[in-house]
Structure formats: C-alpha cells, structure tokens
UniProtKB/Swiss-Prot annotation:
Chief localization: cytoplasm
GO CC terms, sorted: cytoplasm; prefoldin complex
Protein name (Swiss-Prot/TrEMBL): Prefoldin subunit alpha
Family: Belongs to the prefoldin subunit alpha family.
Keywords assigned by UniProt, alphabetized: Chaperone, Cytoplasm
Length: 141
C-alpha cells in the first residue's frame, strides 16, 4: 500500500509540473509575440525616419486601411501602459524599444531556464513512477 501512495504522490506532482510547463510555454509564446511586435515597430520607425510628406497606409480596423501623409517623423507617441501614451523624440523611442526588447529577451531566457528545470524534475520522477507502477501491478496480481 505504501508503494501505491507514493505512486499517487508522484503522479500528482507530475500533473502539477505538467500544468506549470504548459503555463510557462503559453507565457513564452506571449513574450515572443511581444518581441515580434517590437521588432516590427523598430523596422517601421526606421523605414519612415526622415520621410516627412511621404504617403503611407494607416490601419483603421478589420483589415482596412486609409492613405495618409506623414507630417512629422521626428516624434513618436508611445504607449506606456494603462491607457497612457507619451511623446518621445525618434532616438528616445528607438532606445525605449531596444530596452523593452532586451528586457523581454532576458525574461524569455529565464522562463526557458525554469522550463528546463521543471522538465529535468519530471524526467527524474517519471522513471520512479514507472517503477512503482510495476511494483503495484506485480503485487496486485
């Protein structure tokens, strides 16, 4: 009976770890998506820098666009969260984007390390569970 209890404990632990793995993977995907958005923003700003007066397409929703003329590319209005946006000059905006990307890449790396640690623990627990399962099945016959 002792083996049965230990097996149940390990299976419960494995289930908890599996849930953590799935959650971390989802969070990592969200971070990757944000990094990708920042890279697109960075490229777009680089492409329009100094192109005052040029025509561009502006998204207005539902996959629709209108033509617009760039008036001033020296300043960027950036969201800082909680519905708040601030005006930054071009250089500060680019620096802010790079800083955010670096922070997110560091976070992604830490998440990857946590994922590896949990996976390592699971790899150690799985053989224990298999061994206990064999014992429990063997004693039950």
């Amino acid at each position: 009976m002792e083996d049965q209890q230990r097996l149940e404990e390990i299976v419960n632990q494995l289930n908890i770890y599996q849930s953590q793995v799935e959650l971390i993977q989802q969070q990592m995907e969200a971070v990757r998506a944000t990094i990708s958005e920042l890279e697109i923003l960075e490229k777009t700003l680089s492409d329009i820098q100094g192109k005052d007066g040029s025509e561009t397409l502006v998204p207005v929703g539902a996959g629709s666009f209108i033509k617009a003329e760039l008036k001033d590319t020296s300043e960027v209005i950036m969201s800082v969260g909680a519905g708040v946006a601030i005006k930054k000059n071009f250089e500060d905006a680019m620096e802010s984007i790079k800083s955010q990307k670096n922070e997110l890449e560091s976070t992604l790396q830490k998440m990857g390390e946590n994922l590896r640690k949990i996976t390592d623990i699971m790899m150690k627990l799985s053989p224990q569970a298999e061994e206990l399962l064999k014992k429990v099945r063997g004693s039950g016959e």
